[in-house]
């Protein structure tokens, strides 16, 4: 036997292994390329190279199918096809002066309409300018869809204009983030995003649209091959790759697809949990309900919830978007001395209310009270639990649905009237004291409490209030009374300044017949005063910005409003006796289609003494 045979066999075996590894790697690479380029899909689905249709049309069709009536934007080339297509389908496109305003407006529409609010911004800075507004929507649990443009897929990571990793920015802020990879993916991705935004605990979602997904085939082809002339072997390979790339973008693009809304799933209290709460409430002598913003969410109409609360007859404290739920002068609505009431209460229902800073992290609740907590979000449901407070019953479910079920199960229940009237009497005494404080002159300028009482006296029943500011707005929450359900908008737990302009825009579109007021602080006004330009421009077709803005500042902001095409008035100590007359004048100008800014100089009071402004 030849002694070299084992060595030769070993070498041959090694070569075979190397060849197998090489073939395996080559096969994997080819399969990866085939998958990336959708080569198998392209075998069965045609590309219509002559079609002038574009991805923006599909976006508009999906939005229309989901009942979207308004789209807010600051336009840019990356997203122009969406804007054009939406206008053609009758979706109102409203352009703002800042991208954050566009998201705030979408947020307001979501809250007031019960559907998703939509904002569309161009790539890079256009998208990054929305981060604060999207975080605000997340913390306010508002279903907002942000559509952002981006660089073409082929150019990502290669130094294209305004090309950044946008998805990484929004993953911590959004329930769902996605980048669309082909025209055929537009409908399923958007349907999924909109459903996720509204299911369980609502929140914002972000969908990125690369440039080459939105424009027609012939334009994308022209841009891809604009600088390509090579006819070498490598050039032919590159040409094949690029052709396959474009083919994948448009393969099956215009085939029929389902555009209808996907089902929205909501957590609900079980019958056993409701019965457990029935037993607690039926034995209660001093029950209290604290309602938070979650109770205004679909599917329960706010009118049905209001009827439910009135039938239960349990005294209520209202916070956030729930302000106004019981109207202006309900005997069940307790506005003052919440801390003292909670010390006495034997059963407290936290209906969509969170034990965060607004309830002293739960420390405001008595350890003797039986606590029923209801919230869609488990983390919020148990925030600070077993530290400063302890839930007797914790229900992960929709708060409004729970209250309706509780009322149905408590037929014949009557809350002790001495408890209700006692709380209301304390309320009356406190409000009388506030009115007395309002009559005390300040060292300079106007007493803000008196100003707010004047405003409250003149607000019509269809008015809608937007709170955008710090101390002044906190005072307004005690003095000014929202007229009904969903007539008060504030930023929510994030406490964002600058929501006013966007909220007003969205609110006026949803409620064109309402008188919309922004209660501004001087700092918050600075964030959105340029939106007076937006209000003026868009009143041409709908007279939508019939809003009054009440701000407190030392600068001539009323002159700025005039410069932007609106109306402006100054109210100070010199014309204090004309306060109600000026408010009526502002209202009259609004009815004639003019946005109005009432610039009021106010002095200091001790109304919020002891509060820390942070």
Question: Where on the chain are the PLM-derived regions?
Answer:
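Active-site diphosphate/adenylate-binding microenvironment
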Residues: 56, 77, 82-84, 426-513
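Thiamine diphosphate
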Residues: 147, 155-164, 302, 339-344, ...
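Terminal signal-anchor or tail-anchor transmembrane helices
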Residues: 4-42
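Phosphate/pyrophosphate-binding active-site segments
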Residues: 39-47, 220-225, 231-268, 274-275, ...
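Glycine-rich phosphate/diphosphate-binding loops that line cofactor/substrate pockets in enzymes
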Residues: 27-39, 58-68, 108-113, 196-201, ...
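Glycine-rich, acidic loop regions that bind phosphate or pyrophosphate groups
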Residues: 4, 17-25, 148-190, 208-215, ...
